[in-house]
UniProtKB/Swiss-Prot annotation:
SUPFAM superfamilies: SirA-like. Belongs to the sulfur carrier protein TusA family. Pfam families: TusA. InterPro entries: TusA-like (IPR001455), TusA-like_sf (IPR036868). The active site is at residue 13. This is Putative sulfur carrier protein NMB0681. It comes from the Bacteria.
Amino acid sequence: MNSETLDVTGLKCPLPILRAKKALAQMQQGDVLTVLATDGGAPGDFEAFCRQTGHVLLDASEQDGVFTLVVQHK
């Protein structure tokens, strides 16, 4: 299982999701993508994205205005 980090801080919707989708397309089942985002809608966007695509949102947290979203490839 591999893990990668994607920094999309400063980007607004829909760019964080689009960049994550592109990164996940290069990953294998079970791999984990950690996304760093500052868009306030990111947690809800990633929850919906995972629900629609079958990926798993393992964790969503916020510290000092930066959201950390951990997504496992389906």
